[in-house]
Amino acid sequence: MSDVFSGGERALFLDSKHRRYLVTLHPEGEFHSHSGFVPHADVIGRAPGVRLESTLGARYIVLRPTLEDFVLEMPRGAQVIYPKDLAPICVLADIGPGVRVYETGIGSGALSMTMLRWGATIRGVELREDFLNRATSNVRSFLGEQALERYRVTVGDSYESVPDGPYDRVVLDLPEPWQVVPHATSALAPGGILVAYTPSITQAVQTRQALDRQWTDVRTLEVLHRTWHIEGQSVRPDHRMVAHTAFLTAARFIGS
């Protein structure tokens, strides 16, 4: 990675109110807002952290976007899994370099990007081709063309089968994950891990009921994300928090 911004790269503009703007830099391009504009040429060739002013005097700090920044600001078709759940999913699934993952319900690719970033090789299935194309585009945009060598995705229905096993991990984000559990038992290697992301507790309950004696170490949790206000001697929880988004259910496959 270069020490300075270059054309074609994504940059994150932060204004004085901490609002974020994800921009793709072009030599002739301009970043426009209600507070004037900043030529992209003022960013290209400069190091991350550069401070700039717009034509109307608005101040910005320009940084390279993190994975979290990109997930929150990237183009999307489907609802994404948010960062507060992405990391716990990867920890529950024990994602790491070389791990073979079957992912279904790809959506806009937020979880795919996170697992690829952690080193996994992904075989993905998505019911809708427009979602699949969006996810592939987002992966390419943030991680680069080389990441696609570990990312094979096709249109299909995981309720019918889980193709091309064996896998080390099965990660599910779809309305009825319990329908995929029987297929996962024939696709997972012994000791493999299944993780299901379900917005409602009834979905989590039905998923748990589908996990029979071939599974162990079954657990369900949710992640509540609360930030804190710290300013001098004023220290308190922020008035708002990111509370429930989904239940995460994890289990280990031990076979019959």
Report each predicted region and the residues it spans:
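C-terminal substrate-binding/active-site "lid" region of AdoMet-derived donor-dependent transferases
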Residues: 178-247
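Conserved class I S-adenosyl-L-methionine
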Residues: 96-107
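Conserved SAM-binding loop of SAM-dependent methyltransferases across substrates and taxa
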Residues: 108-119
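S-adenosyl-L-methionine
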Residues: 125-177
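N-terminal auxiliary segments of SAM/dcSAM-dependent transferases
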Residues: 1-64
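Conserved SAM-binding loop and adjacent beta-strand
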Residues: 2-3, 72-87
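Short glycine-centered segments of the SAM/dcSAM-binding site in methyltransferase folds
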Residues: 100, 121, 191-193
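Glycine-rich helix-loop-beta junction characteristic of Rossmann-like nucleotide cofactor-binding loops
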Residues: 91-96, 162-164, 186-187
